[in-house]
Design a protein with these regions (language model features):
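Canonical P-loop GTPase G-domain recognition
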Residues: 171-184, 189-256
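Charged helix-capping and loop-helix junction motifs
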Residues: 164-170
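Conserved ATPase-coupling elements of RecA-like P-loop NTPase cores
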Residues: 105-108, 159-164, 194-198
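Conserved G1/Walker A P-loop phosphate-binding module
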Residues: 1-126, 142
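Inter-motif core of Ras-like GTPase G domains
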Residues: 106-159, 175-176
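P-loop NTP-binding site
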Residues: 3-7, 12-14, 18-27, 36-40, ...
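Conserved nucleotide-binding/hydrolysis micro-motifs of P-loop NTPases
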Residues: 99-103, 154-157, 190-193, 218-221, ...
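Conserved catalytic network of the ASCE P-loop NTPase/AAA+ motor domain
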Residues: 84-89, 140-144, 175-179, 206
Length: 384
C-alpha cells in the first residue's frame, strides 16, 4: 500500500479529519512522537512560510529524565493542516498532546511532598496535577480525537523501570476500549530492533489484542510512520462481510437445511470479528461441516468491507439434486443421463402443455402438431 493510499483510506474512514490523540503514561515519549510526526508529515505540507514557522514554534518540548514536560493538553499545530493528495482529495490532520497518566517515580506533579495544585478549565477550583492530567486525557480521547496512538515504553527512554508504567498503561487502554475508537500501541525503545523489544511487543499484543509497534520515536523515519498509520487502518471496525458462494445455494427454498447451516455459521463468524485486523492474514474458520474452505478475496480498508469466498463440498450438490428430483445422482457420471432423460421428457411435455391447460379450463384440449410432424403431399379430390 502506497503512502497516498494509506492517507486516502484513513481520510475516508474519519470523514476527512484525522485528529490523532496521542495518549499513554507520562514519560514515555508522547511529545517526542508528536514532534517527529509533525516534522515528517505536517510541516512539509504547510505552504505559507509564516504559518509553517509558527507551527514549528508550537511543537512540544521533549527531554530525557523523569520530569514531566507536558503540563496540559495541546493541539499540534493549533490549526489543522490541510493535506492535498496527488491522486485527488484532501484531509485535515493534527495531533493532540496529552499529559498522560501518572506513574511512580515521575517528577513534577508534587511540590514539597504534597500534590501540586493547578487551575484547569474543567474545574472551578484548583485540583491536584494528576487529576487535571487524567481529566484532560479523557476529554481528548472522548471528544476530540478521531483515532488514538498509545505511547508506552520498555523503560529504556527514561530513568524509570518498565513495571512502573504497567498500571497507567492498562488504565489508558481500558479507556480507549470502552470508547471504541481505533488505536494502535507504540512501544518506545532506544533499541526497537532488539529481541527483548520484540518479545515485549508480542506480549503486549497478546495481552491487549491490538497492534503493538516497537519504535524509537526520536529516530522515527517516514517509512516507519507510514507503517504505523497502515497498522492503524487495520484497527478500524468491519462494516460489512460479503460472502461469495455457489449461486445454487441461494436458489434453495427458504429454511432449507443447507442454507440454515451455512447462514448460522456465517452469523457466528461475523459475531467473532470486529476490526479489520481480526481477518487480515488469518485463517477464516466457518464452523460448518458442509463448507470445505474459506478464502479472503478482498478487503476495502476505506469502507470496512470484507469479501470472502466459501466453497461447498461437491457431493452436497449431488445430494441435494437427488433430494429435489427423487433421482439417484451421486456424481457427474450419473448426472448426465438424468439431465438428458429429463430434457426429452420436457420436450414431450411442452407439446401437450397447452392442451392440458385447456383441459383444466374447459374440459377438453387439442394437441397441435409441431412443424416437424407435418408432411405436405399432392392434394387429392375426395368425392362423397
Amino acid at each position: 500500500m502506497t503512502q497516498e493510499q494509506i492517507y486516502q483510506n484513513i481520510a475516508r474512514r474519519t470523514g476527512g479529519d484525522i485528529y490523532i490523540g496521542v495518549v499513554g503514561p507520562v514519560r514515555t515519549g508522547k511529545s517526542t512522537f508528536i514532534k517527529r510526526f509533525s516534522e515528517l508529515l505536517l510541516l512539509p505540507h504547510i505552504q505559507n512560510e509564516a504559518q509553517r514557522a509558527r507551527a514549528n514554534d508550537e511543537l512540544p518540548q521533549s527531554a530525557a529524565g523523569r520530569t514531566i514536560m507536558t503540563t496540559e493538553p495541546k493541539f499540534i499545530p493549533e490549526k489543522a493542516v490541510n493535506i492535498e493528495l496527488s491522486g485527488g482529495g484532501s484531509f485535515r490532520a493534527r495531533l493532540i498532546d496529552c499529559v498522560g497518566y501518572m506513574v511512580d517515580g515521575a517528577l513534577g506533579h508534587e511540590e514539597q511532598d504534597a500534590p501540586r495544585l493547578v487551575k484547569s478549565p474543567w474545574f472551578d477550583h484548583e485540583v491536584p496535577f494528576d487529576l487535571a492530567a487524567e481529566t484532560g486525557t479523557r476529554r481528548v480521547i472522548r471528544e476530540h480525537a478521531t483515532v488514538g496512538v498509545v505511547v508506552t515504553t520498555d523503560g529504556s527512554v527514561a530513568d524509570l523501570p518498565r513495571e512502573n508504567y504497567c498500571e497507567a498503561e492498562r488504565r489508558i487502554i481500558a479507556e480507549l476500549e470502552a470508547i471504541g475508537k481505533p488505536y494502535v500501541i507504540l512501544l518506545n525503545c532506544t533499541d526497537p530492533d532488539s529481541d527483548a523489544a520484540h518479545q515485549l511487543a508480542a506480549q503486549l499484543q497478546d495481552t491487549y489484542q491490538r497492534a503493538v509497534v516497537p519504535i524509537n520515536c526520536v529516530a522515527m523515519t517516514a517509512e516507519e510512520l507510514d507503517g504505523i498509520l497502515q497498522r492503524l487502518l487495520y484497527e478500524f471496525p468491519i462494516r460489512e462481510i460479503a460472502v461469495q458462494m455457489p449461486s445454487w445455494v441461494m436458489m434453495l427454498e427458504p429454511g432449507h437445511w443447507l442454507q440454515s447451516a451455512v447462514y448460522t455459521a456465517m452469523l457466528k463468524f461475523a459475531g467473532s470479528v470486529h476490526k479489520m485486523a481480526d481477518i487480515a492474514g488469518k485463517n477464516l474458520p466457518l464452523e460448518c461441516e458442509y463448507i470445505t474452505k474459506t478464502i479472503l478475496t478482498g478487503m476495502d480498508l476505506a469502507s470496512g468491507s470484507v469479501h470472502i469466498t466459501a466453497m461447498i463440498a461437491p457431493d452436497i450438490f449431488y445430494k441435494i439434486l437427488g433430494e429435489q428430483t427423487g433421482l439417484s445422482i451421486v456424481d457427474e457420471a450419473s448426472l448426465l443421463p438424468c439431465v438428458v432423460s429429463l430434457a426429452k421428457a420436457k420436450r414431450a411435455y411442452d407439446k401437450i402443455k397447452s392442451a392440458l391447460d385447456q383441459v383444466e379450463a374447459t374440459g377438453y384440449g387439442i394437441v397441435m402438431p409441431g412443424i416437424e410432424e407435418l408432411t405436405l403431399e399432392v392434394p387429392e379430390i375426395v368425392r362423397q
